[in-house]
């Protein structure tokens, strides 16, 4: 067969889309077309920040039906989403309550309990995963302690992409790359860790053994009656994005830039040394037995909140105004946990500057400048940490995802990090999702083969560092952890 048509359902924390890929195996050309885009936002339910899971499912099905109604024969479907959040099911496979968002404050104070009762080094030795206050391990502990009546109804817990696959196929699956984000998977066995799971109060029977990407979960029956295989892709959206990152060699790092920024490198081994623990480095699962050695950064979430609060709709105009301002007048630590979900983001940024005896950003452009400069400097700080961890410097940084369209931030990143930046592709998560589907369909050999297809079909933009830039001169002075409470500490 010359042509393959694969559908990627790509859900982010702020939006979702259903994308159709067309792959010509003879010429190795790959094109994407957006079929359906929809909003994903938090809602308050009984005092919790929850996801409107039924609305998301409705939009997924609508997007799939739109493809089928075009008369296109779909070869496969794959679903990727953000990590750590889950859906609870009862014995009949029906949903129990609404899934609570990782941004809800129910986990406040939970992580410190684990550090005392299990031990930080012991948790890291078992999982290899960074300490984030909203990891699934702490969410489940909050659930079982705060909502025992709800907990008593639970028979299964599915992570977000696995839930939507279940709704399409009727088959349950626990995909490995996303499962590792829970901080509950043992890094040596690739199975759920008994000690960590027992501490949460959740039952091991809620979970099946994690499966690596590339297996067929089951079939979705389209309106026309065709059975379409649903593939377990690398269902954590960052895992998919890394698959589509055209990393040139072992000296290349990646930055998946969106609501979250995730900076790291690909490795055949995990890094769980005392140095890695001190730097709060995570070893999330990747495709083909590779590890995504990385660190979470609070990313463009800060900007997204400012845009919403101040009703800014013309982002290109804002960036142009921002570029005209002097650099590094206002600096914050984007990973300060005060920015996870404040009531008023721009007021929180202003307060952080005021508390550190800096000028206070007032205008929209000044707030954006503060965010961009601070992110670029934090990128440089973390890239330095990663290089020290592996004992080799990086020579190139690949920025993928929606944030790679921000030319100003890309250049600031190149200047601060002091290395060449390659930006693109934008639709990295979708492409990585498609890549695993094509491998499952035996159209591609492996991840490296797929990256060659990506490089041949998608243009990258190069940014050369300017060592004389204002931000480059501030790198040595920027110490984000000195005056703030780190999100990942």
Swiss-Prot record:
SUPFAM superfamilies: Actin-like ATPase domain
Reactions catalysed: L-rhamnulose + ATP = L-rhamnulose 1-phosphate + ADP + H(+)
EC number in record: 2.7.1.5
A Pfam family this chain is assigned to: FGGY_C
Residues of the active site: 237 (proton acceptor)
Paired cysteines (S-S): 68-222, 353-370, 413-417
An annotated GO cellular component: cytosol
Family, similarity comment: Belongs to the rhamnulokinase family.
Official protein name in the record: Rhamnulokinase
Annotated organism of origin: Salmonella newport (strain SL254)
């Amino acid at each position: 067969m010359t042509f393959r048509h694969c559908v990627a359902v790509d859900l982010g924390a702020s939006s979702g889309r259903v994308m159709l890929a067309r792959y010509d195996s003879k010429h190795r050309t790959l094109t994407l077309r957006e079929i359906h885009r929809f909003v994903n936002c938090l809602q308050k339910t009984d005092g919790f920040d929850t996801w409107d899971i039924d609305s998301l499912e409705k939009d997924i099905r609508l997007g799939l039906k739109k493809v089928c109604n075009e008369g296109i024969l779909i070869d496969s479907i794959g679903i990727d989403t953000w990590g750590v959040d889950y859906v609870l099911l009862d014995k009949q496979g029906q949903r129990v309550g609404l899934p609570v968002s990782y941004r809800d404050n129910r986990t406040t104070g939970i992580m410190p309990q684990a550090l005392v009762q299990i031990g930080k080094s012991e948790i890291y030795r078992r999982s290899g995963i960074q300490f984030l206050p909203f990891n699934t391990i702490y969410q489940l502990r909050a659930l079982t302690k705060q909502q025992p009546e709800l907990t008593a109804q639970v028979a299964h817990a599915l992570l977000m992409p696995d839930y939507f696959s279940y709704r399409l196929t009727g088959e349950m699956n626990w995909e490995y790359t996303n499962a590792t984000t829970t901080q509950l998977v043992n890094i040596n066995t690739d199975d759920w860790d008994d000690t960590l799971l027992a501490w949460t109060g959740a039952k091991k029977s809620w979970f099946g053994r994690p499966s690596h990407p590339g297996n067929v979960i089951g079939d979705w029956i389209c309106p026309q009656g065709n059975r379409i295989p649903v593939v377990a892709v690398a269902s954590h959206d960052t895992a998919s994005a890394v698959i589509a990152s055209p990393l040139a060699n072992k000296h290349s790092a990646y930055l998946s830039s969106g609501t979250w920024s995730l900076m790291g490198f690909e490795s055949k081994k995990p890094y769980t040394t005392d140095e890695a623990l001190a730097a709060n480095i995570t070893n999330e699962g990747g495709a083909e037995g590779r590890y995504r050695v990385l660190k979470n950064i609070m990313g463009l979430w800060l900007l997204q909140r400012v845009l919403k609060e101040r009703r800014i709709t013309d982002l290109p105009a804002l960036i142009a105004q921002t570029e005209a301002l002097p650099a590094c007048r206002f600096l914050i630590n984007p990973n300060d946990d005060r920015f996870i979900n404040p009531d008023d983001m721009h007021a929180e940024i202003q307060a952080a500057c005021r508390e550190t005896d800096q000028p206070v950003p007032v205008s929209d452009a000044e707030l954006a400048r503060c965010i961009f400069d601070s992110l670029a400097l934090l990128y440089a700080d973390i890239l330095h940490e990663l290089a020290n961890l592996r004992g080799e410097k990086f020579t190139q940084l690949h920025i993928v995802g929606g944030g790679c369209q921000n030319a100003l931030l890309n250049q600031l990143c190149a200047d601060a990090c002091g290395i060449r930046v390659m930006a693109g592709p934008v639709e990295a998560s979708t492409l990585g999702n498609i890549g695993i589907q094509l491998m499952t369909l035996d159209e591609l050999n492996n991840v490296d083969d797929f990256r060659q297809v990506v490089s041949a079909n998608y243009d990258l933009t190069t940014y050369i560092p300017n060592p004389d830039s204002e931000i480059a001169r501030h790198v040595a002075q920027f110490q984000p952890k000195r005056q703030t409470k780190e999100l990942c500490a």
